[in-house]
């Protein structure tokens, strides 16, 4: 059972208040993501220097360097994605527990069930990709399940398959599912506008605020319990 505040009417002010409470952990998430990116850039640069520039600079050496960089990108992409998903997971944890999520709590949660989150991300990414490959609309439909799916993965012990199945049914077969989808699309548009007009800086506030709002809305409308 989620905390009582999860079932309050979602508003801009409540999302803003929740955002202010979580500025430390949100900043930590942004910084961690930036550090992972910088480390990857340094690794990629080192690979190109050692194999491409300081090597014989042949087509083979450059091709080998490119392959090595692509392989090195895999773990960094996984780690970056896991850190990024905390933008949704932190609001989920907040409304489920009713307590401000600290930096330690957020990253402890991430490391405690690391492989569960990795596999959940791979599974969701695979399903979404399949949807986009065969037809764009199914891919979009799967992607819109993200707020509910991340919640189920982070705050419950249900299997990955059950979490996806329940999330999909909650969004597309529940009484208030279509209403939630409308809110999700509108929130996404507002976040996009705020990001564009501020040359990206607005995303630092708009993205987490949107996540807090959607988690609150999902609980209020009965998609999450």
Q: What label would you give each PLM region?
A:
Residues 1-7, 220-225:
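Short, charged juxtamembrane terminal tails flanking transmembrane helices
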């Amino acid at each position: 059972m989620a905390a009582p505040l999860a079932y309050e009417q979602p508003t801009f002010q409540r999302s803003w208040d929740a955002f202010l409470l979580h500025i430390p952990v949100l900043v930590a998430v942004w910084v961690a993501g930036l550090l992972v990116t910088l480390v990857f850039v340094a690794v990629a640069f080192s690979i190109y220097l050692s194999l491409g520039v300081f090597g014989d600079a042949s087509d083979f050496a450059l091709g080998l360097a490119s392959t090595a960089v692509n392989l090195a990108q895999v773990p960094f992409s996984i780690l970056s994605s896991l850190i990024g998903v905390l933008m949704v997971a932190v609001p989920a944890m907040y409304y489920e527990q009713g307590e401000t999520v600290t930096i330690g709590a957020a990253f402890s949660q991430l490391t405690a069930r690391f492989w569960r989150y990795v596999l959940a991300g791979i599974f969701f990414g695979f399903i979404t990709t399949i949807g986009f490959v065969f037809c764009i609309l199914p891919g979009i439909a799967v992607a819109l399940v993200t707020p509910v799916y991340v919640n189920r993965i982070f705050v419950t012990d249900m299997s990955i398959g059950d979490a996806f199945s329940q999330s999909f049914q909650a969004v597309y077969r529940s009484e208030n599912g279509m209403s939630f989808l409308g809110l999700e699309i509108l929130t996404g548009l507002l976040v996009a506008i705020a990001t564009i007009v501020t040359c990206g800086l607005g995303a630092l506030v708009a993205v987490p605020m949107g996540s807090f709002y959607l988690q609150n809305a999902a609980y209020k409308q009965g998609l999450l319990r």
